[in-house]
Amino acid sequence: DDKARVKTLQCLNILDTQREERFDRIARLAAQLFQCEFASISFIDEKRQWFKSLVNLSLEQTTRETAFCAHTINHASTFIVPDTHQSETFKGNPFVINAPHIRFYAGTPIVVNGHRIGALCVFDPKPRTFSPQEEGQLNDLCRLVESELNREELTWLTAQLSQKQTALEENQKLTRVRSVILEKVVNCESLPSVLKHIVESI
């Protein structure tokens, strides 16, 4: 269900935010570990691929149609293209024909609440293989990305809970004041007495 997937992504409030070192660090590590020129952490919404982190390229986003990672989110595990020139799906891709001239790609889906919302990927202008051990390492790095996203979600939920709790406390306080006013009016107490009890109730 792509609508549920996109909704999960939107609820993270991560799209169109500033670059962050905690994500950049993971992307840099991926590029270094697998000796690839490029690496990225990207998210796929309805129409685009948006980059939270990108190593050695200056892009904010691409269309979903041209995004390698849009294919990655259709797979439960690491998606690998050893040589794009040998792939009917990718040999005509604009990022293969033109800069950065992608020949090799490997991406692992980023999963939040059961939905594959994006990918951590490495890619290079030279074709190459990708071993099962390397798949496992890329998967481990991707889990770090998910941990950061879950921490972000927890922070946001905590802030929302705090706001709701404050609103509830204010509402309860208002209810107490109303009860005091009603009680004093029913008992025909003087206005100064009513005001005094209101102040004490706040």
What positions do the PLM features span?
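Amphipathic alpha-helical "output/dimerization" segments
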Residues: V112, F130-S147
